[in-house]
């Protein structure tokens, strides 16, 4: 029991710091906030300092999280499996929207689909798992591409070979013009650009570094996407991609 109490004391102290409270705390403050006596707090802090889990400012003697925490958190984040985390949420999204939902990631200079949940319309279109497409090939791809850093975007654009899926397919030039709009709105649209009769809306997923790592799209038969349905699907898509991003360690805010 004594060992358990000691472990709980350590956790209580470490949990005083979170992403919303990046502050330094003094010995008295920590003791008051946790209800642990100062002598015990001091011993715990000294032990945590040895392992670089906390650091102390020599000027004001206050404590904050150390680089050891960063190493531990990085190990956790590296083991996060995007598809495993996203799949149950994408199933919920598909159920809520009653449309097909797809998930894809970057594969060198292209986009590859890694998950798909069919909607009630069971429409067949160019987004099977394992399918590789250029970054102008659909809403999910464009959503991810537009949120890459400018250096990567320029690199991909230079190697991009244009392919027409339909008469409405947008090539390199149109994609460049669309990037700013997608970044501003937080979502992308694909209006029969890959499959005739199919409309899709896409949004990115971010990781703990704030980097775009994936794109999600809600797609269905264009005739069923009334302005009202499109707005509902957009809100649901942004909500669910934000939830997935948070689970991947992202700390930014959701787009409205």
Task: Report residues per predicted region.
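N-terminal helix-turn-helix
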Residues: 1-79
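Short, structured helix-loop boundary elements
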Residues: 3-7, 27, 62, 66, ...
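Amphipathic alpha-helical regulatory segments at dimerization interfaces
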Residues: 16, 33, 85-96, 185, ...
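Hydrophobic packing within well-folded, soluble alpha/beta domains
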Residues: 30, 41-44, 48, 54, ...
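Amphipathic alpha-helical effector-binding/dimerization core
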Residues: 61-159
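Cysteine/selenocysteine-centered motifs that mediate thiol-based redox chemistry or coordinate metal-sulfur cofactors
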Residues: 155-156, 238-256
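Extended hydrophobic
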Residues: 168-240
